[in-house]
Design a protein with these regions (language model features):
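Conserved beta-hairpin
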Residues: 27-63
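Short, Lys/Arg-enriched, disordered terminal segments
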Residues: 1-3, 110, 154-156
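Acyl-donor binding region in acyl/amide transferases
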Residues: 71-135, 143
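Conserved acyl-donor/pantetheine-binding loop and adjacent beta-alpha core of acyl/acetyltransferases
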Residues: 51-55, 59-83
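Short, solvent-exposed loop/turn segments at secondary-structure junctions
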Residues: 44, 66, 124-125
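Short amphipathic alpha-helix that is part of the acyltransferase structural core
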Residues: 1-31, 38
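C-terminal "cap" of GNAT-fold acetyltransferases
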Residues: 143-156
């Protein structure tokens, strides 16, 4: 089950676990064109028991005008046309991939002004492997971050 977090009380306890951008304040993540989503096991599953208690994964998204290459660029939210996935972490194997796919699908269905789905990823081999394996294509590398794009047409 995908849940959009609306309050500081919901976001604050999770920020301490952010391995990519732990210094970004919790309140900043849910203001001015930025959102936080959490993936949980479906608590109402009839066939399978709930296997994971608590959040399985978290993703933070900024809706920006163009592609961000720095954290500062994530504040350019006045005329958004791009969903920037700027941090994702998981507590359960496979949940990172699942939350990226589910949030991209949700945004595609609910925000028609968003035409691109791009990451603001750290310059690590792990980030590169994660996004390439999930179907993203490499866009560019900056001095502090790199971008990968999930093509809109391929998002379910």
């Amino acid at each position: 089950m995908l849940l959009k977090l609306e309050t500081l009380e919901q976001v604050y306890p999770l920020v301490k676990d952010d391995p990519v951008r732990p210094k970004l304040p919790a309140d900043w993540r849910i203001q001015n064109g930025r959102e936080v989503y959490v993936l949980y096991d479906d608590q109402y599953a009839e066939q399978d028991p709930v296997l994971f208690d608590g959040p399985r994964a978290v993703i933070c998204v900024a809706f920006t005008d163009g592609i961000a290459l720095t954290e500062k660029d994530l504040e350019n939210t006045t005329n958004p046309n791009t969903a920037m996935f700027y941090t994702v972490w998981s507590y359960d194997k496979g949940a990172g991939r699942q939350i990226v796919n589910e949030v991209a699908s949700h945004i595609k269905k609910t925000r028609e002004e968003i035409g691109r789905f791009v990451t603001l990823s750290p310059l690590t081999e792990m980030a590169e492997r994660f996004h390439i394996r999930n179907g993203a294509v490499f866009l560019r590398k900056g001095t502090l971050c790199q971008n990968f794009e999930y093509e809109r047409e391929k998002i379910q």
